[in-house]
């Protein structure tokens, strides 16, 4: 029960952070970038998001379920992790290649932003949050994600000027 309470607290803190950061960033970015750049960002992000969805393709849910069932059997746990992560890497590689082909062939006017969005796709490919959720180590995932969100926010304020 103690572990469940800690995991719940970690999750609540992270969810609050997920609501606060956009609340702070949206007005700043809207004023700084303007309507055109916000629209271009939203458009290009929606494209990369489809490729991220294909990369993960239910792996988060399946991974948590499979890992939580095998977390006490080390040999089976390693095998489960390898097979799930191998599938994620395979789908991610296909997505990365397809995304860059689409970016070059069909969307060359937005190529620079689409190239930068490769970072989102790569982060989805290497993301193993499902493993840590499966072994009930919420603190690792929440701490890492919170640090990334806070650093990203600080970098946006420092680097996005005009």
Language-model region placement:
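Signature of the first transmembrane helix
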Residues: 3-60, 100, 153
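Hydrophobic faces of transmembrane alpha-helices in multi-pass small-molecule transporters and flippases
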Residues: 1-24, 85, 89, 114, ...
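Short amphipathic alpha-helical segments, especially helix-boundary/capping motifs
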Residues: 1-5, 24-26, 38-44, 77, ...
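Hydrophobic transmembrane helix module of multi-pass membrane transport proteins
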Residues: 88-162
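Transmembrane-helix boundary and interhelical linker motifs in polytopic inner-membrane proteins
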Residues: 2, 33-37, 51-86, 133-139
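A general secondary-structure boundary signal
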Residues: 4, 8, 56, 80, ...
